[in-house]
Amino acid sequence: MVSWMICRLVVLVFGMLCPAYASYKAVKTKNIREYVRWMMYWIVFALFMAAEIVTDIFISWFPFYYEIKMAFVLWLLSPYTKGASLLYRKFVHPSLSRHEKEIDAYIVQAKERSYETVLSFGKRGLNIAASAAVQAATKSQGALAGRLRSFSMQDLRSISDAPAPAYHDPLYLEDQVSHRRPPIGYRAGGLQDSDTEDECWSDTEAVPRAPARPREKPLIRSQSLRVVKRKPPVREGTSRSLKVRTRKKTVPSDVDS
């Protein structure tokens, strides 16, 4: 782990940052010799980075692998060994010059195919999206049509036109019942007398009425203090005897006159 971190640090500093600054100086001073040198270095280093991806996967278990890699980077960069220029002149330049035409043809084909593949994938994506939208629309229409067909004419006629049931407040049931009652004497045929009011109401709406009680006059304060004395019932026999007696008394008065 330590060797891997040291190796990455060496490659970053001595393999990238220092050559980048040296290339900047060569471009600024317009020194052709230095310019060619660092161009050869960057070509070799690019090939090294491409090969490093494969070697890190398959050969990283090899002992002293990271140490060898650090030594190789320093050998490429060193002005004494000139490893980058040596590898470029001996191996890279001859192989590239040999296969230059083939590489150019592959690059052109890759550009054309990449453009065509992008267009084909775009068309396929649009076609898939359009087909999915059409299928979803047809499925929804088919489901709606199936539901409508399931209803027969009898089912449609059986649907009542009655309004939806309203909410009944338990605190104001009497007011709601009075609003629901039809007017007095109302029937399907027209208005009738008030005597037939009970017959007009249905069984559910008919409410039994309590017998009306006569209103008693409120007692005055003076009357409430009085004691009502009731006369004892008079018998019939006594009333007749009194009448007879009165008649007997009236007779002698006439004779004297």
From Swiss-Prot:
A GO molecular-function annotation: microtubule binding
Residue intervals passing through the bilayer: 1-21, 42-62
Modification sites for Phosphothreonine: 196, 250
Phosphoserine: residues carrying this PTM: 152, 194, 202, 253
Tissue spec. comment: Expressed in circumvallate papillae and testis.
Chain segments carrying region Disordered: 183-257
Membrane topology, record value: Multi-pass membrane protein
Intrachain disulfide bonds: none
A Pfam family per the record: TB2_DP1_HVA22
Protein localization: Endoplasmic reticulum membrane
GO biological process: cell division; endoplasmic reticulum tubular network organization; mitotic nuclear membrane reassembly; nuclear envelope organization
Source species, domain of life: Eukaryota
GO cellular component: cytoplasmic microtubule; endoplasmic reticulum; endoplasmic reticulum membrane; endoplasmic reticulum tubular network
Keyword S-adenosyl-L-methionine carried by entry: no
Keywords associated with the record: Cell cycle, Cell division, Endoplasmic reticulum, Membrane, Microtubule, Mitosis, Phosphoprotein, Transmembrane, Transmembrane helix
Main function: Microtubule-binding protein required to ensure proper cell division and nuclear envelope reassembly by sequestering the endoplasmic reticulum away from chromosomes during mitosis. Probably acts by clearing the endoplasmic reticulum membrane from metaphase chromosomes.
Family per record: Belongs to the DP1 family.
Identification of the protein by name: Receptor expression-enhancing protein 4
Organism: Homo sapiens (Human)
